[in-house]
Amino acid sequence: GGLIIKNSSDITNIHDLKNKKVGIAGGSIDKSWLFFRAFFKKKYGMEATAFFRTSFAAPPLINGLLKTGDLDAGINYWNYNARLESQGFKSILNIEDMLPILGITGDLPLIGYVFKEELLEREYDLVKRFLQATNLSRKILEESDEEWDRIMKLTGARDKEMLITIRESFRKGIPKSEIEILNQNIIKAYDILKDIGGKKLVGEGEHLAEGTIWNAN
């Protein structure tokens, strides 16, 4: 995800957002927004909420308000930004741009699967095969343009141009770092999000609980 504006906007950088209306997808503890707040605090030494006017809404509504001009900018999820980028919008700051400033180098997985440990005891091979299948599916989507054409309706793309922006955004977001780097970055990301989101986000957890990350052998 990231910060998106109209191509015709007079906003060219973060400083131009002062007192502007910025829509945030999700709620106040959405991870993209928390990363943005952490980045803003680290780079500019201030709280983003005191710099521009924020409002929270569902991703489709953020896109709609951007199109009507009721918002000056939006922080939305990658797939919604990709749709806008084929309709006269552009991203000026993405999550991957913020992470190095926050001390995270290499890729950071932002989506994963959650399951109970007891499932591993009962169906270890099934879980392992499921993850293998998702990896193979991702590989197909990374390499095959024809597969994207086949699933176009599933993506919500209205035309070929929108499909291409969704496809390329998806491919750009596939983590390619070694598993050890990914695991380290997940732990670092937890600490960053905890410091900004506080107990409302993580409860009493000071650090990512041991065993949270599971890698199939």
Model-derived features: where do they sit?
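Flexible glycine/proline-enriched surface loops and loop-helix/loop-strand junctions
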Residues: K18-V22, G112, F170-K176
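Pocket-lining segment of extracytoplasmic ligand-binding domains
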Residues: P60-M152
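Short coil/loop linkers at secondary-structure junctions
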Residues: T12, M46-A50, K90, A157-R158, ...
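Secondary-structure end/capping motifs
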Residues: E121-K199
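Short secondary-structure capping/turn micro-motifs that flank functional sites
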Residues: A82-R83, P100-I101, R158, E168, ...
